[in-house]
Amino acid sequence: MEASTVYYTDFRCPVGTSLTDKLRRLCIAAGIKNIDMEGKFVAIKMHFGELGNLAYLRPNYAKVVADLCKEQGGMPFLTDCNTLYPGSRKNALEHLTCAQLNGFWPMTTGCQVIIADGLRGTDEVEVPVPNGEYCKTAKIGRAIMDADIFISLSHFKGHESTGFGGAIKNIGMGCGSRAGKMEQHASGHPAVQEDLCRGCHRCAKECGSDAISYNEKNKAVIDQDKCKGCGRCIGACNFDAIYALCDSANEMLDRKMAEYAAAVCHDRPTFHISLVQDISPNCDCHGENDAPILPDIGMFASFDPVALDQACADACLNAAPLPNSQLGQNLATPGWNCHHDNFKDSNPNIEWKATLEQAEKVGMGTRAYTLKKD
């Protein structure tokens, strides 16, 4: 496959310019105006940040992208899907409140926010995975698949399970419904935390496989042989008593995530933007953000999310670690087994290259790229 073009700009701003100006110019240089958006719904997929985390992308960046879409006649909306774990984004009401508290609402972003998989995280579409090896279909939030055009706006940072979180993670994991996230993280089966179960029987009413019964203490019990892994019981429980069995090894998670991302992007116009700044060691899903492991690097954009992630990863690998950080502390530890890899030296139990390998294998894009500085 021919190398893809990735466009890049740094964060330097002479007097009279701004970062939002630079992002706008970058998107235009990378070709966003070549997409026919007239009268079309445009999903702008991003992460609104968990409450307490301050490393997520500012809403000002989202407004730049939304304004460009509207200038081209598009109807943009910001979107994300509900989380699998308990937190401030596990259902649409709390998710919208979290987004608003973190600054995402029409006055700041220029468009509406829609939680793509609905109130309980169960409003999904099963989408075929092109050339899928680990997943034949992907469970994707309905509003994302209803959009005519898909744009990812990603905060590129470290990640404790996948090495880094960039475009592919934002798309693959982020667009999965709660059941889709469970399939990626696990064998696809949930379990019950008995002390949280209230015995309300709501989960059993939602189960289409007759897999849930109740023990002598009126606590839910899931028959794993009957369970189909649809995840509706997780959405049904108001008390966070049902959770996913996170038994997938990190490499399997990486590969499933890449296949989910390929399903989202297949057969429609897409465009991808990543900002490599506030490079925290872990996911923005945390309710905190540790000190950045690397200095701010720049903004990247491309039609190819695989090339985009590879370019961002390479830039991070070539950056100097910051001393007062998880990465810097690890490297300064006597006897540390240095991997000469900023992601792996920050979180040693990861295999980040598997994501890019699988994404390329299923035809989502190429790791080969040409970098053009705007």
Language-model-derived ranges and their functions:
Residues 66-67:
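Terminal amphipathic helices with adjacent charged low-complexity linkers/tails
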